[in-house]
C-alpha cells in the first residue's frame, strides 16, 4: 500500500476550500495547486495527479481511512483470500454510490466524472482498493473529472464533488457500521469455501471442479450473466465428487 510521502504537509479541508475559492475562474492549469493531502472527518483525501485540461484523462484521487475508523473486524481481512474478497466488495459498494453522483457536477469535457475500476463477475486483487492487513487501513483510488467551463476552473462544482459527493460515498461504503454485516460475512465465507476447494483439488488428483446446479451458459457473447432458463449442470455419476466445505457443508459436482 502506498504510504504518505515524507515532506508533504497535511492540510485541512478548510484550507482546500479556501484554495478552491482563490483559483476559481482562473485558467485550468491552476488546478495543479490542489495536489496534496487534506484531512477530512474520518479520512484523508489525496489529490495525487491533476489532469492537464478538462478533456484529458481524469485526475487521480485517493482516500485513506484508518482501520480504527473503518471498524472492520480483523477476521474479515486477516488472510489473503478474505482480504481480496472484502476489498472487492468495498470497491463495488463505492462504485455503485459514485455512479449516482457522476456528472452531477457540470462542466465541459470530463467535468463531474467520478469513477473507480469496474468489476466484472470475477473477484480479483486490485490496486483500486487495498486493505493493510496489519492495521486494517483502507486505501481506495478513484478518478475525478475536475470541472471547468471551457478551460476555466469551475471550483464551485469541484466543491460539490469533494465536500458533498465523495464524503457520502466514503461513509456509506468504507465504514463497517454503515454496511450489511451479514452480507460481508457471507462474502468472506464464500471466499474461504472457494479457497478450500482450490487447495483440496491437488490432494484428490483433480484440476477443476464444477458444482451440480451450476448454470454455465452465458446470457450472450458479451455478457457474464447466466442464461435465463439455462439447463443446470449435472455431473455424470462416474465423475462425481463430494467435498465438505468449512461453511456451506457438503457440495457435490464433477471433478
Model-derived regions, located:
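N-terminal pre-Walker A segment at the start of P-loop NTPase domains
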Residues: 219, 223-249
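N-terminal accessory targeting/assembly segments
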Residues: 1-218, 222-230
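Glycine-rich phosphate-binding P-loop
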Residues: 250-255
Amino acid at each position: 500500500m502506498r504510504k504518505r510521502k515524507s515532506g508533504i504537509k497535511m492540510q485541512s479541508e478548510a484550507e482546500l476550500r479556501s484554495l478552491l475559492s482563490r483559483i476559481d475562474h482562473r485558467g485550468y492549469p491552476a488546478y495543479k495547486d490542489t495536489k496534496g493531502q487534506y484531512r477530512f472527518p474520518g479520512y484523508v483525501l489525496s489529490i495525487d495527479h491533476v489532469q492537464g485540461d478538462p478533456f484529458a484523462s481524469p485526475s487521480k484521487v485517493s482516500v485513506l481511512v484508518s482501520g480504527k475508523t473503518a471498524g472492520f473486524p480483523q477476521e474479515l481481512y486477516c488472510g489473503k483470500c478474505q482480504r481480496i474478497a472484502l476489498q472487492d466488495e468495498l470497491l463495488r459498494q463505492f462504485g455503485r454510490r459514485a455512479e449516482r453522483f457522476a456528472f452531477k457536477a457540470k462542466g465541459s469535457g470530463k467535468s463531474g466524472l467520478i469513477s473507480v475500476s469496474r468489476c466484472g463477475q470475477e473477484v480479483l486483487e486490485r490496486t483500486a482498493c487495498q486493505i493493510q492487513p496489519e492495521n486494517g487501513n483502507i486505501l481506495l483510488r478513484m478518478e475525478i473529472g475536475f470541472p471547468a467551463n471551457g478551460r476555466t476552473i469551475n471550483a464551485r462544482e469541484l466543491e460539490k464533488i469533494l465536500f458533498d459527493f465523495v464524503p457520502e460515498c466514503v461513509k456509506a461504503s468504507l465504514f463497517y457500521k454503515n454496511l450489511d454485516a451479514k452480507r460481508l460475512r457471507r462474502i468472506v465465507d464464500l471466499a474461504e469455501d472457494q479457497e478450500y476447494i482450490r487447495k483440496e483439488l491437488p490432494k484428490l488428483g483433480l484440476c477443476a471442479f464444477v458444482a451440480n446446479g451450476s448454470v454455465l451458459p452465458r446470457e450472450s457473447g458479451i455478457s457474464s450473466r447466466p442464461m435465463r432458463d439455462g439447463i443446470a449442470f449435472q455431473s455424470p455419476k462416474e465423475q462425481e465428487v463430494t467435498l465438505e466445505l468449512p461453511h456451506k457443508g457438503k457440495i457435490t459436482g464433477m471433478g
